[in-house]
Amino acid sequence: MRYSSGAVEALIEEFAKLPGIGRKTAQRLTMHVLQERRGEVEKLAAALIDVKEKVVRCSICQNITDLGTDPCLLCTSTGRDRSVICVVESPTEVLAFEKTGHYKGLYHVLHGVISPLDGVGPDDIKVRELLARISPDSEGGVREVVLALNPTVEGETTSLYISKLLKPLGINVTRIARGIPVGAELEFIDEATLSRAMDGRSAV
């Protein structure tokens, strides 16, 4: 059943486009917005606009960063091990590893994985940018690349593709330990398990 208000239906449809949000949840969110004070709704609207206007991708690691902070704080930190790069699918995995307080290297965010069924190929994710960071012409010093992609078919395909590109460059390519359940998403794995997975990484 649809609401008679076109504005309500339009907001429900927009909420329902978000990952993991079905129509029922979208309806609840819409009702919440309707019941909130105007000032709170305006703050939400402003935050949505700000995140599109003031957040960019780091020119080095492709992680998200505020406009005016490029390269990002992780890439410019003097306390990171610059010889190791951990490759992840999205910024949420960077946050997950940082929460462990265990990994001290750098990151590279692919913003996706190879998925032929979805029409996503190597050129559609940030593989080229990764290669540029560790090519012989780069300022690098990178000795190890850790593949920390989700244990899915697409993640495995992407890991294999990247490892084949990196091995001829003499880079030590490793992957996090297989204690992560197949099909699980790294952003939802607890810190202790992620730390053990990083410690137990093995050569590809």
UniProtKB/Swiss-Prot annotation:
GO terms for molecular function: DNA binding; zinc ion binding. Keywords: DNA damage, DNA recombination, DNA repair, Metal-binding, Zinc, Zinc-finger. The keyword Plastid does not apply. One of its GO terms (biological process) is DNA repair. Signal peptide: none annotated. A zinc finger (C4-type) spans 58-75. PROSITE patterns: TOPRIM. The keyword Zinc-finger applies. SMART domains: TOPRIM. May play a role in DNA repair. It seems to be involved in an RecBC-independent recombinational process of DNA repair. It may act with RecF and RecO. Belongs to the RecR family. PANTHER family: RECOMBINATION PROTEIN RECR. This is Recombination protein RecR. It comes from Chlorobaculum parvum (strain DSM 263 / NCIMB 8327) (Chlorobium vibrioforme subsp. thiosulfatophilum).
